[in-house]
């Protein structure tokens, strides 16, 4: 029996003999076999830049090698890290199903790149990492559920998969299930349509660790929330570990049932914020080392200073620089990096909205001094503009709730939540407020040259 991983490793060995080392290291080294769906061999690339290049340049080349190895003509599909999160991952069973050619099919494994050893720890994710490791070492005994929230590409999925890998390696016969809430919803709807709700429930209520991503997409789906509520209760009562991720804390997920919200708050809630400069440099160094790349320190510093949004874009920028260097056959320097990234740096740097910028713009609009936003004054003429500024800070920046609270005179994160909820409700009926906010955002973008 050949697994898809075995086939892919054999494929890579042939590819390596037919490509220059710089090209191989740039385009192929970080790829992995993702899954086999019917006659389609799915390959995972580290980011969309590499994915697009592979699709354009190497699809037929890879298909020919796969046919040479297996005697079978496959369709080849490439996906990137973000697309991977829409797939279901489960633990491979001891006797996996085989297709007619003896190739392992069906279930998808946890992403092999997402383990604790490859996770770079920094100030913005240290607590989330520690909590995830504690849960991995003692499932259902440390924090249950563990709720991790933060923006796109900051490492939530990485930590969830790392827990899954750790449990697999240290707990014999442990059943680990990873999926997105969208996948849960779609399967639930299909089970109702096909009269297979019992099979659906058996599948998700008989695992040792349930990892469910992007739970915010359950908002507004009453039937799915009902089903997940009972799934949660069953697993919790049987002392099975539940880990949930979201782009926001439970209190901020709209139209989420209170009973689910309260259960999400039973365990530990931790956030992940964008990496600081030191962490971004460390991420680039680790990525370069893992891919066998020799990147000058000044180049990594340049990239880290330019790309401060999330890890996915940071690593994508590094790959872009390396690829550009290979294509133009020039050494990697800070100047070359600037040339390679010129199309993406303007959008990532000039369009950053800051809390201080929001405070200044709202203050000018309502004739409120900046110091009043941070003061303890509660008069309506100050409190209401302050709430608007908090609302905009939550909507237009990646800052965490505690960070926003700090910028408004050290206020508690619950104050920020209250302000956001209040303005959100008023916007549903108050046309004057809608007009005010539209004008404020227009002024804000003008002040930061965002046209």
UniProtKB/Swiss-Prot annotation:
Region (Domain I, interacts with DnaA modulators): 1-72
Biological process annotations from GO: DNA replication initiation; regulation of DNA replication
Segments of this protein annotated with the region Domain IV, binds dsDNA: 326-451
Residues that coordinate or bind ATP: 153, 155-157
Record's keyword terms, sorted: ATP-binding, Cytoplasm, DNA replication, DNA-binding, Lipid-binding, Nucleotide-binding
InterPro entries for the chain: AAA+_ATPase, Chromosome_initiator_DnaA, Chromosome_initiator_DnaA-like, Chromosome_initiator_DnaA_CS, DnaA_C, DnaA_dom, DnaA_N_dom, DnaA_N_sf
SMART domains the UniProt entry points to: AAA, Bac_DnaA_C
Coiled-coil stretches: none
Region ranges (Domain II): 72-108
Keyword Nucleotide-binding tagged: yes
Subcellular locations according to the entry: Cytoplasm
Residues that span the membrane, as ranges: none
One GO term describing the cellular component: cytoplasm
GO molecular function: ATP binding; ATP hydrolysis activity; DNA replication origin binding; lipid binding
Domain III, AAA+ region: annotated span: 109-325
Annotated NCBIfam families: DnaA (TIGR00362), PRK14086.1 (NF010686)
Subunit structure: Oligomerizes as a right-handed, spiral filament on DNA at oriC.
HAMAP family associated with the record: DnaA_bact (MF_00377)
Biological function: Plays an essential role in the initiation and regulation of chromosomal replication. ATP-DnaA binds to the origin of replication (oriC) to initiate formation of the DNA replication initiation complex once per cell cycle. Binds the DnaA box (a 9 base pair repeat at the origin) and separates the double-stranded (ds)DNA. Forms a right-handed helical filament on oriC DNA; dsDNA binds to the exterior of the filament while single-stranded (ss)DNA is stabiized in the filament's interior.
Record remark on domains: Domain I is involved in oligomerization and binding regulators, domain II is flexibile and of varying length in different bacteria, domain III forms the AAA+ region, while domain IV binds dsDNA.
Family affiliation: Belongs to the DnaA family.
Protein name in UniProt: Chromosomal replication initiator protein DnaA
């Amino acid at each position: 029996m050949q697994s898809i991983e075995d086939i892919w490793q054999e494929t890579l060995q042939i590819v390596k003999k037919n490509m220059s080392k710089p090209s191989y290291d740039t385009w192929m080294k970080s790829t992995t076999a993702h899954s086999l769906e019917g006659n389609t061999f799915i390959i995972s690339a580290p980011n969309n830049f590499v994915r697009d290049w592979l699709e354009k340049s190497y699809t037929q080349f890879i298909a020919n090698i796969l046919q040479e190895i297996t005697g079978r003509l496959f369709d080849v599909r490439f996906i990137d890290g973000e697309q991977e999160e829409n797939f279901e991952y489960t633990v491979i069973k001891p006797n996996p199903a085989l297709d007619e050619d003896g190739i392992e099919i069906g279930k998808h494994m946890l992403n092999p790149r997402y383990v604790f050893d490859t996770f770079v720890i920094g100030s913005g994710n240290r607590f989330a990492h520690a909590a995830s490791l504690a849960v991995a070492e003692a499932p259902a005994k440390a924090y249950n559920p563990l709720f991790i929230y933060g923006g796109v590409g900051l490492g939530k999925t990485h930590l969830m998969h790392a827990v899954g890998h750790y449990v697999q390696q240290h707990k014999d016969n442990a059943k680990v299930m990873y999926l997105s809430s969208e996948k849960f919803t779609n399967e639930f709807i299909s089970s109702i349509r096909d009269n297979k709700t019992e099979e659906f429930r058996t599948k998700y209520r008989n695992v040792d660790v349930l990892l469910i991503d992007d739970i915010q997409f359950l908002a507004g789906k009453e039937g799915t929330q009902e089903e997940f509520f009972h799934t949660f209760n069953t697993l919790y009562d049987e002392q099975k570990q539940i880990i949930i991720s979201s782009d926001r804390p439970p209190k901020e997920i709209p139209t989420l049932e209170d009973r689910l919200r309260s259960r999400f708050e039973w365990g530990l809630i931790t956030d992940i914020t964008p990496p600081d400069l030191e962490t971004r440099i460390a991420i680039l160094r680790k990525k370069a080392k893992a891919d066998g790349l020799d990147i000058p320190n000044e180049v990594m510093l340049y990239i880290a200073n330019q790309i401060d949004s999330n890890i996915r874009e940071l690593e994508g920028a590094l790959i872009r620089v390396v690829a550009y260097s290979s294509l133009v056959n020039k050494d990697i320097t800070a100047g070359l990096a600037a040339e390679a990234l010129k199309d993406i740096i303007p959008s990532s740097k000039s369009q950053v909205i800051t809390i201080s910028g929001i405070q200044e713009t709202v203050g000018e609009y309502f004739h409120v001094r900046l110091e009043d936003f941070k003061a303890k004054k509660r008069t309506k003429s100050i409190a209401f503009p302050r709430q608007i500024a908090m609302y905009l800070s939550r909507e237009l920046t990646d800052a965490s709730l505690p960070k926003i609270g700090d910028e408004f005179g050290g206020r508690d994160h619950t104050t920020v939540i209250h302000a956001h909820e209040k303005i959100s409700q008023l916007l549903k009926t108050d046309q004057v407020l809608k007009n005010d906010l539209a004008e404020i955002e227009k002024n804000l973008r003008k002040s930061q040259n965002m046209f």
